[in-house]
Amino acid sequence: MAIVAVGTEIVQCARIAQMIQQHGEQFLERVFTAAEIDHCAQRPDATGHFSRRWAAKQAVFKALRCHRRGVSWTDIEIATHPSEGPTIELHGIAADLAEEAEIDAIHLSLGGCRTQAIAYVVLCD
């Protein structure tokens, strides 16, 4: 297994909080899947959870080099499995691009504090 690409993103949590406050459900439904919204909304620090997922999606966009290639935000889903922690599931065009690039594994690391969220993604063949 070799590293094909990496992507990283850092975001101010206040920026995501502002987007949620200004655009509400429209923003959430454009960027996050129903499962992601449900997961984050149930957490005491919902803004932090949404921010980390937003950062992860941006990191995937960078690693796949798929900006302006028709990939929607919801084509990249940050799923949470109790035994594994957060993982990336690709759908639609994002999944097609990963298959075309022969990506067999996607590794994700999320972090953050009260004010910032960060994600690091490694794509492997």
UniProtKB/Swiss-Prot annotation:
Protein EC: 2.7.8.7
Which GO MF terms does the UniProt record name? holo-[acyl-carrier-protein] synthase activity; magnesium ion binding
Per the UniProt entry, what are the Gene Ontology biological process annotations, in alphabetical order?
fatty acid biosynthetic process
Q: Which cofactor does it need?
A: Mg(2+)
Reaction equations catalysed: apo-[ACP] + CoA = holo-[ACP] + adenosine 3',5'-bisphosphate + H(+)
- InterPro entries, alphabetized: 4-PPantetheinyl_Trfase_dom (IPR008278), 4-PPantetheinyl_Trfase_dom_sf (IPR037143), ACPS (IPR002582), Ppantetheine-prot_Trfase_dom (IPR004568)
* Name of the protein this chain belongs to: Holo-[acyl-carrier-protein] synthase
Q: Which organism is it from?
A: Rhodopirellula baltica (strain DSM 10527 / NCIMB 13988 / SH1)
